[in-house]
Regions:
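Family-specific functional microsites
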Residues: 1-153
């Protein structure tokens, strides 16, 4: 969803579960498998990226932002949050799907930057990251000579 190498690497690592969750660390070492944010056990990848109660306001803000921007409901889903893939039953254009996928990748990046923090990332930090990375995406579209596509998305 992005030509930025660091974002592509993040997506690769998420897809292949390279980031060690507390549940995975528990299998390798004699450590606790409790989530650093909410102390729930086990802290699997799904928990760390989506189902942790401390992340609920973060993801609610994410989905509310897109519901308002696209003027159609974007339902919360672990598939969308963790992999950027919308459910098959949803009716979004390719451009809308790509925008949601890119934004969810930026959200995952923000979660990873605060992977071990007690406090969850703020929706404002995600929006700030998204705006700065959109600048890079605009440059990419400009170089390719299709700035119109950037603005349509």
């Amino acid at each position: 969803t992005s030509s930025c190498a660091s974002l592509t690497l993040i997506q690769f690592k998420v897809l292949h579960r390279i980031h060690y969750s507390k549940a995975k660390l528990k299998k390798l070492f004699n450590t606790s498998d409790k989530c650093d944010r909410c102390s729930v056990s086990p802290a699997s990848h799904t928990h760390m990226f989506f189902s942790c109660p401390r992340l609920s306001s973060f993801w609610s803000s994410f989905y509310n932002t897109f519901t308002k921007a696209l003027n159609k409901p974007v339902l919360q889903s672990p598939l969308t949050s963790i992999f950027g893939v919308l459910q098959e039953s949803t009716h979004f254009t390719n451009r809308e799907s790509n925008a949601i996928a890119f934004a969810s990748l930026v959200a995952r990046r923000r979660i990873l930057l605060q992977w071990k923090d007690k406090n969850p990332p703020s929706p404002e930090s995600w929006l700030k990251d998204l705006m700065s990375l959109l600048h890079i995406e605009k440059i990419k579209y400009s170089i390719r000579g299709c700035v119109d596509k950037f603005y349509k998305t």
